[in-house]
Amino acid sequence: MAARPITLGIDLGTTSVKAALLRAAPDDPSGFAVLASCARAARAEAAVESAVAGPQGREQDVSRILQALHECLAALPRPQLRSVVGIGVSGQMHGVVFWKTGQGCEWTEGGITPVFEPRAVSHLVTWQDGRCSSEFLASLPQPKSHLSVATGFGCATIFWLLKYRPEFLKSYDAAGTIHDYVVAMLCGLPRPLMSDQNAASWGYFNTQSQSWNVETLRSSGFPVHLLPDIAEPGSVAGRTSHMWFEIPKGTQVGVALGDLQASVYSCMAQRTDAVLNISTSVQLAASMPSGFQPAQTPDPTAPVAYFPYFNRTYLGVAASLNGGNVLATFVHMLVQWMADLGLEVEESTVYSRMIQAAVQQRDTHLTITPTVLGERHLPDQLASVTRISSSDLSLGHVTRALCRGIVQNLHSMLPIQQLQEWGVERVMGSGSALSRNDVLKQEVQRAFPLPMSFGQDVDAAVGAALVMLRRHLNQKES
């Protein structure tokens, strides 16, 4: 019997790098098994290369990101790496890194395995970068796209550099996200390739025509030669130009994917699944019906955004800034109050006790709007507590109301009725805050009364590997 194919998935995240090996598993409901995975902290934060960017600048050192990637791969089992038939790569969207074509990296043969080290490469300016003020953004041309442009988006950053550091841009002739860079270096691509998932995250990209707003950009003096060529997500960018951690030279490498899309792909078994992730923040994503096209003008006040997915479809995504971080704020407040009263209690003890109390308290009239951080579409909204009565003041009541408020806030952004109109039949629940909180699970089931599945955590590295695994299996069948 032929060995089942193995694919490698890599995710280059903001704080960590992850790699996962997947094998086809026809007997498993998911169709795949994770053979091994490894994560390493990137620790890549770097001093900003331009003083003009000020304290809002956020940059990362590419060599540290690659070091974390190499550490991940070195920890994976070598015999399985030798059997890899495809590599999928995803990563943090919106950011931009610049390099010189043909000089972006150098392959070194000295160690146990050939590795590539960055050469004529800038820092990565990340999605968290805040150098583009609202005044600066208002001065930019209006994009011909359904997505608006924000600080930290690749095209906005390039506009900023054009204005404040034009000499910097003259040093480079290629640009992409960090994961586009890795794919280009692995394959020795003469020009970077970019999926529409990452292009849309840069701004000034029209997903309907699958093209950059070249005329709009050119008329504003934008260096359009830096814009990567566009390729379909799920397609092959090229083949590895060297053996790499036992992975054979000539192995297929997929076009880099957005981490949001790869994460959702890892969990969404059917097109009729919605994926709910409650970690620090909250995301609820569903695949839009085929043929759906978003309105062609940006609406920053809309609570749902539409992002390119696969096969020219879109994901509808409600992303709330208020999730597990709100519970953490509440726990911290209680611990602080007790410290003020002369009592010392561990945060972990408070968390487990308050969840226990809320499990016992099945209902409450207390209403908490938990938006302590506002929302992207309502930045000025703060949190509030209403319908307070003397009978609803126990820890159980307050914790139940807080968990309900987190879920109800999400439901107000993307209601169950909307999901059902899109054809959603099941919700896949994931994320650290949801997995360890039975009260949140109960409230999710109350607000979204659909079949629920908990436990399969979203994982962008697994999603990237899965895209390449399914591609390989489809190629074999055809």
Curated annotation (Swiss-Prot):
GO terms for molecular function: ATP binding; sedoheptulokinase activity. One of its GO terms (biological process) is cellular response to lipopolysaccharide. The keyword Amino-acid biosynthesis does not apply. Gene3D superfamilies: 3.30.420.40. It catalyses: sedoheptulose + ATP = D-sedoheptulose 7-phosphate + ADP + H(+). Keywords: ATP-binding, Cytoplasm, Kinase, Nucleotide-binding, Transferase. The keyword RNA-binding does not apply. GO terms for cellular component: cytoplasm; cytosol. Strongly expressed in liver, kidney and pancreas. Expressed at lower levels in placenta and heart. Very weakly expressed in lung and brain. Induction: Down-regulated by LPS. Its main location: cytoplasm. Pfam families: FGGY_N. Its EC number is 2.7.1.14. Optimum pH is 8.5. It is found in: Cytoplasm. Disulfide bonds: none annotated. PANTHER family: SEDOHEPTULOKINASE (PTHR10196:SF67), SUGAR KINASE (PTHR10196). It is linked to Sedoheptulokinase deficiency: An autosomal recessive metabolic disease characterized by increased urinary erythritol and sedoheptulose. Neonatal cholestasis, hypoglycemia, anemia, congenital arthrogryposis multiplex, multiple contractures and dysmorphisms have been reported in SHPKD patients, but the relationship of these features to the SHPKD is unclear. Belongs to the FGGY kinase family. Acts as a modulator of macrophage activation through control of glucose metabolism. This is Sedoheptulokinase. It comes from Homo sapiens.
